[in-house]
């Protein structure tokens, strides 16, 4: 009697980088769908038409070689770079267990943000043994030709973990703010952060080119 062989599965991290174009992600996903690969995680970013796509898949060992071969041919056809990394079951479960960690949002804003500004902020994060999950630009694109007197730059850093010393982190961020001449906001990422709320700054037009109190009075019909 023939014994049924148990199908083994494995995780593969697929990394795609290169010039972005319409349909690129769809082309990659069509190959994964062809082999019924399970998507465990996915992330994509596009900076100045340069794509960075990461997909963590789980597929059976009989198909993994075919998946990588087809993806490699498709990447060559599209003119992008592709790489593969095996992820063990232990590594994957360790990553899953991290989802219970606390999350914080650090927002920094200034008239412009330099590499030195961002370095100062990320050093504070590193000193607290926290990880950066993502960085997102919140403000619009800045022209290098047209002069705009009302230029602002703001980025949001999504952090994972618990600060070693929250009070010290706040103090270090305050010191950074004074030395770098930028403003910051640090808050725990939970349901209360996403609730609608009103924040009013009375800053004598330092950052906001109007008087907030006067504008609120107009809205209230005062």
Listing of model-derived features with the role each one plays in the protein:
Residues 1-196:
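A conserved regulatory-domain signal marking ACT and ACT-like small-molecule sensing domains
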Residues 195-198, 207-222:
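Active-site neighborhood of HAD-like aspartate-dependent phosphohydrolases
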């Amino acid at each position: 009697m023939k014994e049924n062989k148990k199908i083994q599965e494995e995780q593969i991290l697929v990394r795609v980088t290169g010039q972005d174009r319409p349909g690129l992600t769809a082309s990659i996903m069509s190959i994964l769908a062809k082999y019924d690969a399970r998507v465990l995680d996915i992330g994509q970013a596009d900076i100045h038409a340069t794509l960075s796509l990461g997909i963590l898949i789980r597929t059976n060992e009989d198909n993994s070689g075919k998946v990588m071969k087809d993806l490699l041919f498709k990447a060559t056809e599209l003119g992008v770079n592709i790489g593969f990394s095996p992820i063990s079951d232990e590594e994957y479960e360790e990553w899953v267990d991290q989802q219970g960690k606390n999350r914080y949002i650090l927002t920094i804003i200034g008239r412009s943000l330099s590499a030195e500004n961002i370095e100062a902020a990320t050093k504070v994060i590193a000193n607290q043994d926290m990880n950066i999950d993502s960085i997102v630009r919140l403000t619009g694109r800045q022209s290098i030709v047209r002069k705009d007197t009302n230029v602002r730059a703001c980025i949001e850093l999504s952090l994972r973990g618990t600060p070693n010393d929250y009070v010290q982190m706040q103090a270090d961020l305050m010191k950074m703010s004074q030395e770098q001449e930028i403003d910051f906001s640090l808050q725990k990422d939970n349901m209360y952060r996403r609730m609608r709320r009103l924040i009013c700054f009375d800053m004598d037009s330092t950052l906001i080119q109007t008087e907030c109190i006067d504008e609120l009075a107009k809205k209230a019909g005062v």
